[in-house]
Structure formats: C-alpha cells, structure tokens
Amino acid sequence: MGTLLEWLSEGDLTTDGRANEVAELVASSPQLFPDLIAALSFSEPAVRGHAADALEKIARNHPEWVLDYLPALRRAAIADPVAMVRWHLAMVFGHLAGFGETQGPSCQTLERLLHDRSATVRSWALTSLCIIGRLSPNRSPLITRQISALTRDPSAAVRKRARRALETLTNSGLPFPKGWAKGKKVLSEV
C-alpha cells in the first residue's frame, strides 16, 4: 500500500491530488483495489477524499469491482465528515445503477444524501437517483417525488439540476444530460 498511500497523501482537499494516477495504477493492477478501499478509512481527510475520487474513476469502467464493498461504501457515504468523500461515493452509486440488486440499497443511501449539508453532495445524489430512475422506470415515481423537493433547495445549482432531473425522468424522449452519467455501462443504458 506504500506507493498508493503516498500518492493519495499528495495535495489537500482543494485538489484532486494524484487521484487520476492512483485510478490508472489500480485499474492496471486490480490486486490493489482492496488497498484503495482501505484508504477510505484512513485518518487523513485528504487521503480519504483522493481515494474516493480514484474509486469513482475506477467504478466508471469497472463497477463490478465495487459490488462486494457496497455496505462499507454506503456507511462511508453517510458518515464521512469530508464532503469530497460523500460526493464521489454518491457518483459511484450512479455507476452501479446497471446492477439491479444494488438499486435498493443505493437509493436508500442517496435519499439520505439529498439532505446533506453540502450542495455538491446533494447535486450528485440527485444525479445518481436520476440515473437509477431512468434505468428502472418502476423506481421513477418515488425518485421523482424525492427530487422535486430539491427544486426549492437553498442552492441555485441544486435547484437547476433538480429541475433538469425531473424533466429527464418525466420525458423518456429527452437525451440524458451530458456529463451526468460517466460510466461506460451506465452510458450505454441511459
């Protein structure tokens, strides 16, 4: 875990640090994936933030790697005091949307994140819920009700994203908003 931890330690929470390089390293050496997951529990906030960033990037192309860790990631998404960790994990749940068995647990966590103190976390939580709702129309009515409350959010950015999500969920003919779904598996399905 030496090199991985060194790279994750570089920079602070205002930067991505070396998360891109960590993501490339772990993607090319999958045996390091458990070490990346372990870094989410490290005491240093920047390490956890950069680990979550790298994990999100890996989950775009390898969402199946994350499945065994879903319970721990759900706990971290709710409990970690670092907003960067919470928003990247909210994004990961969107990458998992193509795996039907993850949708219920992911929705429960994302619903809680809709009330997060960070506007960025709320924004990515509603985005991932929108992805799930688009892929699973049976979940869409409940998700639509939850997201509609965010059209009155204190953050203008969250209000705007909530309105766009509602349009996307209620009009299947609309293309999915560019930049919202970043994972290969999800992009092919929304």
Predicted regions and their residues:
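Amphipathic alpha-helical scaffolding segments comprising HEAT/armadillo-like alpha-solenoid repeats
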Residues: M1-L5, S29-L40, P63-A76, E101-L113, ...
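N-terminal alpha-helical scaffold/docking segments in eukaryotic complex subunits
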Residues: M1-R48, E167-N171, K182-V190
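Alpha-solenoid HEAT/ARM repeat scaffold
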Residues: L5, D16-N20, P34, G49-A52, ...
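Alpha-solenoid HEAT/Armadillo repeat architecture
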Residues: S9-D12, A27, S41, A59-R60, ...
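Alpha-helix N-cap/helix-start positions at coil->helix boundaries
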Residues: L13-D16, P45-A46, A79, A83-M84, ...
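A glycine-rich, hydrophobic loop/mini-helix early in the fold
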Residues: F42-A76, D80
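Structural signature of alpha-helical solenoid repeat scaffolds
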Residues: E56, G94, C130-I131, E167
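Hydrophobic secondary-structure block in the mid-to-C-terminal portion of proteins
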Residues: I131-V190
